[in-house]
Swiss-Prot record:
Region (Disordered): 80-100
A Pfam family recorded for this sequence: YcaO
PROSITE patterns: YCAO
Organism of this sequence: Methanothermobacter thermautotrophicus (strain ATCC 29096 / DSM 1053 / JCM 10044 / NBRC 100330 / Delta H) (Methanobacterium thermoautotrophicum)
Superkingdom of this protein's organism: Archaea
Domain YcaO residues, every copy: 58-383
Protein name (Swiss-Prot/TrEMBL): Uncharacterized protein MTH_987
Length: 383
């Protein structure tokens, strides 16, 4: 947990009574569906817009963290849906002094002949307002009549917090995470394992022990890109059940590598629980994987499941964190600038319920792990 973060119990107290206002009917624990024992909760919101999921998962090292995580995910999804008060306008890209849509990495077939819908965003690095395509802000996204859609909308960079600064930091960590993951996925390597056996972090040791006791092999992989912000994947292989649908992973990013590892481990536990939970309602992904078979799925994803090319210890990963969200934001912006990423935008999506939510956009960061149709310069220059 970030040193400046509000305790999860306080977050639950502050925002819990607002869940009914956004249509959440219940938050339920699904930890028991799996045998790992790492807390996972699920929030159900039947009123979610068409094109968006209505069940959200939450993770954490404690039950309180996991419950708060599921709750905040629900507020994020609600806030990302278009609302009547959202001020947007339409214009052809050539007639708008806004962000170049191409910098968002468009699918190869995109033709910018039609008008786009725009919304003003704040530039964290320059203080001025800049119009950005609304397609990169709202989820789900349905363009107004006469306007085109640029790509399938997603939730990358959508984040909440107890305060706006915290939400911006979380959103920034997510877009950096997806970029690092995209680069690894597109290159299919190199696999560098993170050895945590010597860690004195009791939370990490406890999480790893839970997987070990359940007979689930977990490998931690260093995905950190040139941005220098620690990004770690936790890759789980259930050697007891040998169920291909349970070949799962989680990814975590933070200036503090220990927090990145904790996020990755809790997320892979969440991936397992939601996969087990989800297969009871939606069998498409699980059925595909089960038809392919356990060994074949591991071969198809050998860049995750093969022997590592190198190993580092957790202590070798650089800790860039400060004691404040503001300090962490400043360091992150500096690291992005050093990688040639000058602009960081955010749109404040805080709604009438008062839970701080933003969408963070960093033009140039890769999104291949979210949308394989979109391949940018960073991937092309690294392959």
């Amino acid at each position: 947990m970030h040193p400046q973060a509000v305790r999860p119990s306080e977050t639950l107290k502050a925002f819990g009574d607002k869940l009914s206002m956004i249509g959440v009917t219940r938050i339920t624990e699904i930890t028991h569906l799996d045998r790992i024992g790492i807390p996972v909760f699920s929030a159900i919101r039947p009123t979610a817009e068409d094109g968006a999921v209505s069940i959200y998962a939450g993770k954490g090292a404690t039950r309180t963290q996991a419950r708060a995580s599921a709750m905040m995910e629900a507020f994020e999804r609600y806030s990302a849906e278009r609302k009547p008060e959202d001020e947007t306008f339409t214009a052809h890209p050539e007639d708008c002094d806004g962000l170049d849509p191409e910098s968002l990495i468009l699918p190869g077939s995109t033709d910018l002949k039609s008008e786009l819908e725009w919304i003003n965003a704040e530039n964290l690095t320059g203080d001025e307002e800049v119009p950005v395509p609304a397609n990169a802000v709202f989820h789900p996204y349905n363009p107004p009549e006469g306007c085109m859609s640029l790509f399938r909308s997603n939730t990358n960079g959508l984040a909440s917090g107890n305060a706006r600064e915290e939400a911006i930091f979380h959103g920034l960590m997510e877009v950096i995470e997806r970029d690092a993951w995209s680069l690894f996925e597109a290159r299919r390597g190199p696999k560098v394992e993170v050895d945590c056996s010597g860690t004195d972090n009791d939370i990490i040791s406890g999480l790893l022990e839970k997987f070990h006791a359940a007979g689930v092999e977990v490998t931690l992989v260093d995905l950190t890109a040139d941005t220098g912000v620690a990004t770690v994947a936790a890759v789980a292989d259930d050697t007891v059940l040998r169920d291909p649908a349970l070949l799962t992973m989680g990814v975590g990013t933070h200036l503090d590598p220990e927090i990145a590892v904790i996020r990755a481990l809790t997320e892979v536990a969440q991936s397992r629980a939601t996969q087990i939970h989800g297969t009871r309602e939606d069998t498409v992904r699980a059925e595909f994987m089960r038809r392919a078979g356990y060994e074949r799925m591991k071969r198809l994803n050998r860049h995750w499941f093969s022997e590592p090319e190198d190993t580092i210890t957790l202590d070798e990963m650089e800790d860039l964190s400060t004691r404040s969200f503001r300090g962490d934001l400043e360091i992150t912006l500096r690291k992005l600038r050093e990688s040639g990423l000058e602009d960081v935008f955010y749109v404040d999506l805080t709604r009438d319920v008062g839970v701080p939510v933003v969408r963070v956009i960093v033009p140039g960061l890769e999104v291949f792990s979210v949308d394989p149709e979109r391949v940018g310069r960073r991937i092309r220059s690294s392959i």
